[in-house]
């Protein structure tokens, strides 16, 4: 082979190898350097601990910083009240420095099946009142304004109207504690099991109207709405003036948008058009493990958020 041809062929071969290498590059790395990386989303989606641990490590603060670099501007943390106080403060400081918002945390000391407000019993009411006071202190450390409350299970030996009245009275007492501090409890209708008292947004709507406080609103978790009844957009419209927060999760599977049957792109556009400016909590898992799954999650939100 002539030297000139050898050089040309070598250059072409090298270019081919380089191209192949680029095509085989780590898709996770590619996603974090995409053209829209860092650009804020149209809506304010809130990540949770563990969502980006493969990219950023186990430290939640490092995950928050990574999420910020990907365009996310808020977090939620169900277990915030269980974290050490110094960690709560560090998370709050990190959010403040980055200009990020704090979504919901779950009211301390309450479980889905242990907070029996429907019973009307003093022991459950006292525990609830104490948890409201503790929630105020947690919120101060993290500059939070939203706390998730679940009334607990049905009490089978009481008529439903009596149970509803008991829940309303308990929530009134709770809002009297948190309202002076600008805190809002968001009541979450759930689909986890048939024993739960609060299951539908219209039921939560009636309770909020009866309580009559700006510190009592609905947590509109679209995963639970889809499982319980569907009809997400019309139901949203019916209860919109009492919605204080949204949570996301596709169904079946409770993973990121695009992995199930819910048309989140249309729903996000509807929420945006309604003028909502708050946080939408990403209360779901990652459909795929590892960095690849985290990259797929980011892309899923970019796709669902591309409604403009």
Which residues are covered by each model-predicted region?
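Active-site-proximal loop/turn and secondary-structure-junction residues that shape catalytic pockets
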Residues: 51-53, 81, 108-111, 153-155, ...
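Active-site acidic/histidine proton-transfer and metal-coordination neighborhood
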Residues: 8-22, 31-39, 98, 114-217
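Catalytic domains of carbohydrate-active enzymes, especially glycoside hydrolases
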Residues: 62-80
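Mid-chain, structured segments of secreted extracytoplasmic proteins
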Residues: 89-122
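Histidine-acidic metal/acid-base catalytic patches
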Residues: 2-54, 58-68, 198-220, 224-308
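Glycine-rich, proline-tolerant flexible connector loops at the mouths of alpha/beta enzymes
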Residues: 76-96, 151-155
């Amino acid at each position: 082979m002539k030297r000139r041809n050898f050089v040309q062929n070598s250059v072409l071969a090298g270019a081919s190898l380089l191209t192949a290498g680029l095509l085989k590059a780590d898709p996770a790395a590619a996603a974090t350097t995409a053209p829209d990386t860092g650009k804020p989303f149209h809506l304010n989606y809130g990540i949770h601990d563990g969502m980006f641990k493969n990219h950023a490590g186990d430290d939640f603060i490092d995950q928050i910083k990574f999420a910020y670099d990907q365009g996310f501007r808020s977090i939620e943390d169900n277990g915030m009240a269980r974290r050490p106080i110094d960690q709560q403060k560090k998370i709050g400081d990190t959010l403040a420095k980055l200009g990020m918002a704090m979504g919901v945390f779950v009211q301390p000391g309450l479980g889905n099946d242990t907070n029996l407000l429907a019973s009307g019993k003093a022991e459950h009411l006292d525990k609830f009142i104490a948890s409201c006071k503790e929630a105020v202190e947690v919120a101060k450390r993290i500059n939070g304004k939203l706390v998730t409350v679940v009334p607990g299970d049905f009490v089978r030996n009481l008529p439903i109207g009596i149970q509803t009245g008991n829940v309303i009275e308990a929530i009134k007492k709770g809002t009297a504690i948190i309202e002076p501090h600008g805190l809002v409890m968001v009541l979450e209708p759930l689909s986890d099991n048939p024993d739960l008292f609060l299951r539908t947004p219209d039921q939560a709507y009636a309770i909020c109207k009866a309580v009559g406080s700006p510190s009592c609103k609905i947590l509109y978790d679209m995963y639970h709405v889809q499982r319980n009844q569907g009809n997400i957009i019309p139901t949203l419209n019916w209860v919109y003036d009492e919605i204080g927060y949204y949570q996301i999760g596709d169904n079946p599977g409770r993973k990121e948008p695009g992995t199930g049957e819910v048309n989140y792109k249309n729903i996000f556009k509807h929420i945006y058009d309604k003028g909502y400016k708050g946080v939408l909590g990403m209360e779901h898992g990652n459909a795929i493990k590892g960095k690849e799954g985290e990259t797929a999650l980011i892309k899923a939100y970019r796709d669902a958020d591309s409604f403009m």
